[in-house]
Amino acid sequence: MALERTLSIIKPDAVAKNVIGEIYTRFERAGFKIVEAKMIQLDDELAGGFYAEHKERPFYKDLVAFMTSGPVVVSVLEGEGAVLRHRELMGATNPKEAAAGTLRADYATSIDANAVHGSDSVESATREIAYFFGK
């Protein structure tokens, strides 16, 4: 496996539940190195730009509203096969379908308030990291 970087966002629902530290502990136990991190409040422009690929989808407005509803923690995780391993740790988008022990099974409440975001490919990770960290 290659050393990769991936973007992780702890979403407003998980931040509001005060589980940032628990999620970071899970990242570290899974062998990820947290190489960049910041807590920010997304506005409509920043959230809308990040999710621009979904602009024509029916859930877009609700997604932007949710992502701007409170602060988020944006992080860059580094590790062997980071993109796929992070997605496995997150679990299925719908927490009702997420495997026991995944972040979404443990911390998410709905398909919308699903606790975390993770890049879906190495290419997406590169683009998403640049979007938030300018690299």
UniProtKB/Swiss-Prot annotation:
A Gene Ontology molecular function term of the record: ATP binding
Protein keywords: ATP-binding, Cytoplasm, Kinase, Magnesium, Metal-binding, Nucleotide metabolism, Nucleotide-binding, Phosphoprotein, Transferase
Main location: cytoplasm
Record has Transferase as a keyword: yes
A cellular component term, taken from the record's GO annotations: cytoplasm
Assembly and binders: Homotetramer.
Name of the protein: Nucleoside diphosphate kinase
Gene (UniProt): ndk
